[in-house]
Amino acid sequence: MKGSEKITVVACYDYSMAALCDGADMLLVGDSAGMVVLGYDSTTRVTMDEMCLFTGAVSRGRKDSMVVGDLPFMSYQACTADAIRNSGRLVRAGADAVKLEGGAAVADAVRGVTGAGIPVMGHIGLLPQTAALSGGYRVQGRTRESALRLAEDAKALEEAGAFAIVLEMVAEEAARMVTKSVGVPTIGIGSGAGCDGQVLVLHDMLGLYGRFRPKFAKVYADLSGEVAGAVAGFKAEVESSQFPRPENSFYMDAGEADGLDR
């Protein structure tokens, strides 16, 4: 995959949307579901049970796309055994691979999970699960030193067996350098055009998440207004008795309703 066609990844969380997004190379069941679907204020509250539920829904909706399930906060950090056990849960739910955040610090976990036969996607740069501990949501790799650290992390993940690495909110020059330094594909999100592929959250692509809109996200179809308009139209037609109409209703056989209105 690296060096050939660009890789497209869409983060989505349910059966219906997965069926519509099946043309993407990969469907990422991100722990961002906690924010855009469950309304949490961060991804750290997402549980394994919730991730298994979302992963199962997406896997049932796809036909061709690879499904990658996110390991949520504290499902893999304590020990390699946890990482293997919880990765197995996501695979049983329907994932083809799992994703976890961190560089060299999680290399042992990556090695353990891949050793158990489960493909792993790495994730470096901005790490949403621990962003509060590292100064918040800031662009990574803006200095030469930090860019080189990212490259070291990427190489550690590759050596541990990761088949791809997400680069989140990494300065474009640094992301391009990291991409060239490893033999596995990099998937950028807010990291410029030099990565081997790109991932976006479906709700950002469709303008459906109202709390904030990341600078790196492009709205390909702003559906929030259309959804609100559809609900308003439904409400108005119900209140004015315009809905349901005859074509939306069912009727008894001829003669069976005689006398029922007395």
UniProtKB/Swiss-Prot annotation:
3-methyl-2-oxobutanoate binds at residues 31-32, 70, 99. Mg(2+) binds at residues 31, 70, 101. Its cofactor is Mg(2+). Its EC number is 2.1.2.11. Belongs to the PanB family. It is found in: Cytoplasm. Homodecamer; pentamer of dimers. It comes from Cenarchaeum symbiosum (strain A). Catalyzes the reversible reaction in which hydroxymethyl group from 5,10-methylenetetrahydrofolate is transferred onto alpha-ketoisovalerate to form ketopantoate. GO terms for cellular component: cytoplasm. This is 3-methyl-2-oxobutanoate hydroxymethyltransferase. One of its GO terms (biological process) is coenzyme A biosynthetic process. It catalyses: 3-methyl-2-oxobutanoate + (6R)-5,10-methylene-5,6,7,8-tetrahydrofolate + H2O = 2-dehydropantoate + (6S)-5,6,7,8-tetrahydrofolate. Binds 1 Mg(2+) ion per subunit. Pathway: Cofactor biosynthesis; coenzyme A biosynthesis. One of its GO terms (molecular function) is 3-methyl-2-oxobutanoate hydroxymethyltransferase activity. Pfam families: Pantoate_transf. Keywords: Coenzyme A biosynthesis, Cytoplasm, Magnesium, Metal-binding, Transferase.
